[in-house]
Amino acid sequence: MFEYVTGYVEYVGPEYVVIDHNGIGYQIFTPNPYVFQRSKQEIRVYTYHYVREDIMALYGFKTREERLLFTKLLGVSGIGPKGALAILASGQTGQVVQAIEHEDEKFLVKFPGVGKKTARQMILDLKGKLADVVPDAFVDLFSDTERFDEKKGTSAELDEALEALRALGYAEREVSRVVPELLKESLTTDQYIKKALSLLLNGKR
């Protein structure tokens, strides 16, 4: 089991990043790959090594707490790695925990791949068991007020963001519905993803 991988970001795509560590490139699937930027600065990614008969993959996270919630979600029947990543990519960690504790199925079914049965299973399996997942400990990667001083998004960034949404499991009709709102903004890829997920989870679907 790998605890974490340190290295340099060599590639960022809709589903994963590639971290170069001593000449070896690690393909790591993450909730929102675009929070990572290619640079000469070494980073640390906390990892989860997922092994099944037909698949072996590394999943990566900014914090141990984020990884902990991912592993707890994997323990719920009906939720696989892709579904767990989609939930984490929303940036609504606190709301997810609150929804589980308050048995708010209507909020949980907003995530791709989560129907009423799975939402109910999440509540049954996780309610009262998330005390060690502290939302305040999460790095706030999804703040609507986050802005870079100089870098602004272009149409290329928007295209990348839409591909990332599709990779998370959102249907084309859902993606299309948020495009008009996104076209009003000039953001980075990461910021477009955050904005789109905020719109999707707040009813514009």
From Swiss-Prot:
| Record-linked InterPro entries | DNA_helicase_Holl-junc_RuvA_I (IPR013849), Hlx-hairpin-Hlx_DNA-bd_motif (IPR003583), NA-bd_OB-fold (IPR012340), RuvA (IPR000085), RuvA_2-like (IPR010994), RuvA_C (IPR011114), RuvA_C_sf (IPR036267)
Extract the ranges annotated as region (Flexible linker): 142-152
**Highest taxon of source:** Bacteria
Question: Which stretches does the entry tag as region Domain II?
Answer: 63-141
**The keyword Nucleus appears for this protein:** no
SMART domains membership: HhH1
* Membrane-traversing stretches: none
Chain residue ranges for the region called Domain III: 153-205
**What cellular-component terms does GO give this entry?**
cytoplasm; Holliday junction helicase complex; Holliday junction resolvase complex
Q: Where is this region: Domain I?
A: 1-62
- Give the principal location in a single coarse category: cytoplasm
Name one process (GO BP) from the record. DNA repair
Any one GO MF term held by the record is: ATP binding
Localisation: Cytoplasm
Which keywords appear in this protein's UniProt record, sorted alphabetically?
Cytoplasm, DNA damage, DNA recombination, DNA repair, DNA-binding
Family, per entry: Belongs to the RuvA family.
Q: Its quaternary structure?
A: Homotetramer. Forms an RuvA(8)-RuvB(12)-Holliday junction (HJ) complex. HJ DNA is sandwiched between 2 RuvA tetramers; dsDNA enters through RuvA and exits via RuvB. An RuvB hexamer assembles on each DNA strand where it exits the tetramer. Each RuvB hexamer is contacted by two RuvA subunits (via domain III) on 2 adjacent RuvB subunits; this complex drives branch migration. In the full resolvosome a probable DNA-RuvA(4)-RuvB(12)-RuvC(2) complex forms which resolves the HJ.
Query: Main role?
Result: The RuvA-RuvB-RuvC complex processes Holliday junction (HJ) DNA during genetic recombination and DNA repair, while the RuvA-RuvB complex plays an important role in the rescue of blocked DNA replication forks via replication fork reversal (RFR). RuvA specifically binds to HJ cruciform DNA, conferring on it an open structure. The RuvB hexamer acts as an ATP-dependent pump, pulling dsDNA into and through the RuvAB complex. HJ branch migration allows RuvC to scan DNA until it finds its consensus sequence, where it cleaves and resolves the cruciform DNA.
Domain notes, please?
Has three domains with a flexible linker between the domains II and III and assumes an 'L' shape. Domain III is highly mobile and contacts RuvB.
HAMAP family for the chain: DNA_HJ_migration_RuvA (MF_00031)
Question: Record's NCBIfam families?
Answer: ruvA
The molecule here is called Holliday junction branch migration complex subunit RuvA
